[in-house]
């Protein structure tokens, strides 16, 4: 997912969900009384979600660090937002074995939207998030996909000889919670395992509607990891096959291009956790050490 400019203009789902979640949790986050909060964002991509929705929440003296595993994304964001004060971008693989020393234990807050489903070693990533927070405490707000129809589409495309060469490692690009029968409980346990004893985990059932074939194709082009592996003259064929599978899954509404819509029902993990032992009880609807899990029957 390295097409930064395309992603900047085709991440409607990410923007929609990030704004709703930040609006909901802004008053819950533990903001410093001196206004000198340091916040690191994991998986900032092109930077527009971070700058449009996260930065406005920071106190005026707050420091912001946006990170991404893609150097191209970091370069794009650094250039696009170079005039922003108290803001910088740098490369970071949140699944790395050892955090860069200059980042470890330096932050009051960590946020991450639509990134952790790319990380197969979730426990390692959560351990790094825990260690990014200051020793005296801090909090994190995380949102990522537990499941999405796109993963099933990828698996079907891989069975096609035309695309299989480019998709041998398809499982590496499927959320580690996609096959889980209890993603909320599983993620909650991972948080406990790395030290986040106090946390709230929800699984939200959502549906996003893509208006028209071109809108859906543009979104796929922005996030699909396989397109950059194949010749450019095959991209449109791949996207056409993608759309055909979506239609076969009964996720289409409308019969012609003018009123065609595509439904994307997905499960979203939303988690808030604090590193400190002190906890505000009214954050939760359940007693301490119990986690609220919505959308799981």
From Swiss-Prot:
It is an enzyme of class 2 (transferase). InterPro entries: Methyltransf_12, SAM-dependent_MTases_sf. GO terms for molecular function: farnesoic acid O-methyltransferase activity; methyltransferase activity. Predominantly expressed in corpora allata. Also expressed at low level in testis. Keywords: Methyltransferase, Transferase. It catalyses: (2E,6E)-farnesoate + S-adenosyl-L-methionine = methyl (2E,6E)-farnesoate + S-adenosyl-L-homocysteine; juvenile hormone III carboxylate + S-adenosyl-L-methionine = juvenile hormone III + S-adenosyl-L-homocysteine. GO terms for biological process: juvenile hormone biosynthetic process; male courtship behavior; methylation. Gene3D superfamilies: Vaccinia Virus protein VP39 (3.40.50.150). Pfam families: Methyltransf_12 (PF08242). Disulfide bonds: none annotated. Its EC number is 2.1.1.325. O-methyltransferase that transfers a methyl group from S-adenosyl-L-methionine (SAM) to the carboxyl group of juvenile hormone acids to produce active juvenile hormones in the corpora allata, the last step during juvenile hormone biosynthesis. Also able to methylate farnesoate to methyl farnesoate. Belongs to the methyltransferase superfamily. This is Juvenile hormone acid O-methyltransferase. It comes from Drosophila melanogaster. The lineage of its organism: Eukaryota, Metazoa, Ecdysozoa, Arthropoda, Hexapoda. The gene is jhamt.
């Amino acid at each position: 997912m390295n097409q930064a400019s395309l992603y900047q203009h085709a991440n409607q789902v990410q923007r929609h969900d990030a704004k709703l979640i930040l609006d909901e949790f802004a008053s819950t986050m533990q903001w410093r009384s001196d206004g000198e909060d340091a916040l690191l964002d994991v998986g900032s991509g092109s930077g527009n979600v971070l700058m449009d929705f996260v930065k406005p929440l920071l106190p005026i003296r707050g420091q912001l660090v946006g990170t991404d595993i893609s150097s191209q994304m970091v370069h794009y964001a650094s250039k696009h937002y170079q005039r922003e004060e108290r803001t910088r971008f740098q490369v970071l693989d949140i699944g790395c074995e050892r955090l860069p020393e200059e980042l470890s234990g330096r932050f009051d807050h960590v946020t991450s939207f639509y990134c952790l489903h790319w990380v197969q070693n979730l426990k390692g990533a959560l351990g790094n998030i825990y260690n990014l927070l200051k020793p005296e405490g801090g909090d994190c707000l995380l949102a990522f996909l537990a499941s999405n129809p796109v993963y099933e589409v990828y698996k079907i495309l891989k069975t096609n000889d035309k695309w299989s060469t480019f998709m041998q490692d398809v499982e590496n690009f499927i959320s580690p919670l996609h096959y889980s029968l209890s993603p909320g409980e599983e993620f909650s346990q991972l948080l406990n395992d790395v030290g986040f004893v106090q946390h709230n985990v929800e699984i939200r059932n959502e549906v996003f509607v893509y208006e028209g074939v071109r809108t859906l194709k543009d979104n796929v082009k922005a996030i699909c990891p396989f397109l950059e592996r194949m010749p450019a003259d095959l991209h449109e064929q791949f996207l056409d096959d993608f759309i055909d599978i979506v239609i076969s899954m009964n996720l289409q509404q409308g019969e012609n291009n003018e009123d065609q819509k595509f439904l994307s029902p997905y499960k979203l993990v939303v988690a808030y956790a604090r590193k400190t032992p002190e906890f505000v009880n009214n954050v939760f609807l359940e007693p301490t050490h119990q986690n609220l899990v919505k959308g799981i029957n």
